[in-house]
Amino acid sequence: MVSRNIESTSKVPTFHVIREVYDSSNAHERFEAELDKALEAKLDFIVIEPPRLGDETGRWIWVGNCLHKTAVATGVVSLVASLLWRDRPIIAAPACALSIFCTGLYTVSWNYDPCCQYQVENNDTVLEKLPLTDVSSPVILGYSPNSKTKYLHRSVSLLSAALCAWQIWRSYNRFVHSAGSG
C-alpha cells in the first residue's frame, strides 16, 4: 500500500528523521516524544535512528499485526467450521473465542494508537526514493491507513460470533427438546 502512494502520486513524500543524538540524560524520552509528534502528523515516512526506539516500535507494530491477522484467520476458521458442521458448535466456538479475544485486545491496545497506521517499510524500491544517505541502520515506518482492514477485522469477528452463538443456541434447543421428550 505504501508503495502505491509514492508511485501513483507526483507529490514528494513527507518524512521525518528521528536522529540518534544523545545530548542529555533523557534522550530516550525526547526520541519518544519526537516519534509521537511524527505519528500524529501522519507523515508518509518516519525514519528512526535510535536502535532501541526502532526495535520497540517495530515489535509493537509486529504484535499488532499478529493480533489482527490472528483475529481474522480464526474468525474465518470459525465461520467455515460453523457452515461445515452446523450441529457441532464445539468445533467453531474455540476459534470464535480466540477471534473475539484478539479483536478485543487489538481494539483496546492498538486501535487508537497512531502507530497502528504505520508498517515497517522493507520495500527496496520505496526505500531508494527516500534521502537516507546520512542515516545509519534505521527503522523506517511507512504510513498505511488501515480503516478498511479494521472494519474487515471487526466484521469477521462479529459475524463469526453471531453465527457461533446461533449455532450454540440451536444445539441447546435441540438438547432441551430431546431431553424433554425422552
Swiss-Prot record:
InterPro entries: TMEM11
GO BP annotation list: inner mitochondrial membrane organization; mitochondrion organization
Sites of Phosphoserine modification: 25
Membrane topology type: Multi-pass membrane protein
Source superkingdom: Eukaryota
Family matches, as Pfam families: Mito_morph_reg
Keywords for this protein: Membrane, Mitochondrion, Mitochondrion inner membrane, Phosphoprotein, Transmembrane, Transmembrane helix
Example of a GO cellular component annotation carried by this entry: mitochondrial inner membrane
Phosphoprotein is among the record's keywords: yes
Chain ranges passing through the membrane: 70-89, 91-108
UniProt subcellular location: Mitochondrion inner membrane
Role this protein plays: Plays a role in mitochondrial morphogenesis.
Family label: Belongs to the TMEM11 family.
Protein name per its UniProtKB record: Transmembrane protein 11 homolog, mitochondrial
Organism the protein comes from: Drosophila melanogaster
